[in-house]
């Protein structure tokens, strides 16, 4: 009997009940959605960074790093892996306003990529491993010839793999570009061996006597080209700076991953999600609570006679109290259920390959994740 009365009363106050359910739905939906968003960002990016050995620190020296320098850095206690690294923006020959960030990671255990299709990485390969998004946007296929322009010379090779890289998860040409545009800019990797071939050809073009273009001469030129070392390490910046200075006998620039545009922007998006997930739900839930208090007071005042009748019929105070409490429980259950669905939709609208973040992040996996405190 009391159950039927609950639904009759709910129908009588349907406007108030619907508004409370909507407010709770919005509050729970936004709370769950944005908390899922920031947690998904951290969960998916951390896995992607681990899969591609995203560098913890980047070391810069305009004079370049020798192979001996690399050995000394790699030998520092606390450095797990290190590589000499090159990244330079080059134009695509024959194409207007189209360029690539050409990367070379000498030790392919740091700053690597995952192959989406095509050949796996080969340190002696002669081809290019190209961003799959850039290839798709510009109609490049596996096996197509790609030619890059570098200081008056051509660097040519076939596209042997389509990839995604943590170093270019947010693929922008420089700090002035706010959003990725794969129609005009992407990235590619080539092998250290192909880089040495390019250096040899560059020395020839520069008028260097061919009989003097020895392996030692190429090594010297290569040392100047590698002006960056990427490392994996759990050390703090100050400790690493001191250790590198002691190892190399000179001071160089050390930047942590928190200063790198990819990591910095990803964590910035995560912090925005945390803020949205903690502020906005309070507003909607506060409105729902105020509406509920007002409505329940109105119901209790209007149904004094009915409450007296129920007591006369033998209903105990505890059961009557439980009945009127069930109004709030009913509203909360319905609103929470709808809010959980809305929260998932909010998360997927933001964190999916075809969602808002899909135009900003380039990752192979978009698994939605929920923090333990937001599990409904």
Regions found by a protein language model. Give the residues of each.
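Membrane transport/envelope proteins' first extracytoplasmic loop
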Residues: 2-289, 298, 317, 352, ...
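Alpha-helical transmembrane segments of integral membrane proteins
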Residues: 15-22, 276, 327, 331, ...
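Small-residue-rich transmembrane alpha-helices
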Residues: 249, 289, 293-298, 303-305, ...
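Internal alpha-helical transmembrane segments of multi-pass membrane proteins, especially GPCRs
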Residues: 268-281, 305, 309, 321-330
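Short, flexible micro-motifs
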Residues: 30-32, 121, 164, 291, ...
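Helix-capping/transition residues at the boundaries of transmembrane alpha-helices
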Residues: 23, 301, 310-312, 335
């Amino acid at each position: 009997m009391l159950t039927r009365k609950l639904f009759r009363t709910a129908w009588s106050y349907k406007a108030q009940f619907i508004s409370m359910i909507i407010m709770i739905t919005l509050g729970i939906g936004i709370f769950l959605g944005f908390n899922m968003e920031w947690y998904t960002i951290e969960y998916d990016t951390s896995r992607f960074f681990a899969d591609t050995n995203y560098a913890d620190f980047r070391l810069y020296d305009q004079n370049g790093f020798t192979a001996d320098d690399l050995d000394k850095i790699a030998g520092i206690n606390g450095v797990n892996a290190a590589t000499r690294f090159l990244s330079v923006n080059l134009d695509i020959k024959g194409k207007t306003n189209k360029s690539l960030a050409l990367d070379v990671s000498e030790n392919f255990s740091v700053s690597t990529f995952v192959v989406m299709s095509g050949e796996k990485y080969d340190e002696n390969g002669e081809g290019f491993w190209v961003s799959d998004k850039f290839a798709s946007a510009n109609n490049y296929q596996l096996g197509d010839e790609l030619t890059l322009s570098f200081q008056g010379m051509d660097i040519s090779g076939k596209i042997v793999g389509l990839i995604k890289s943590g170093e270019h998860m947010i693929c922008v040409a420089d700090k002035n570009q706010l959003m990725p545009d794969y129609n005009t800019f992407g990235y590619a990797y080539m092998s250290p061996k192909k880089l040495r071939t390019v250096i040899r050809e560059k020395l020839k073009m520069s008028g260097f006597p061919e009989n003097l273009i020895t392996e030692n001469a190429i090594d010297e030129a290569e040392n100047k080209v590698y002006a960056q070392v990427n490392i994996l390490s759990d050390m703090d910046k100050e400790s690493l700076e001191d250790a590198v200075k002691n190892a190399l006998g000179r001071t160089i620039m050390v930047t942590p991953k928190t200063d790198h545009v990819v990591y910095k922007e990803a964590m910035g998006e995560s912090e925005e999600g945390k803020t949205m997930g903690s502020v906005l739900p309070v507003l909607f839930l506060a409105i729902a609570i105020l509406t509920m208090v007002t409505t329940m007071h109105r119901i209790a005042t209007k149904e004094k006679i009915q409450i007296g009748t129920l007591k006369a019929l033998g209903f105990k105070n505890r059961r009557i109290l439980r009945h009127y409490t069930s109004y709030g429980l009913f509203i909360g259950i319905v609103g929470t259920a709808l809010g959980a669905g809305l929260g998932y939709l909010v998360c997927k609208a933001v964190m999916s390959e075809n969602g808002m973040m899909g135009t900003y992040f380039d990752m192979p996996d978009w698994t939605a994740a929920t923090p333990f405190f937001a599990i409904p």
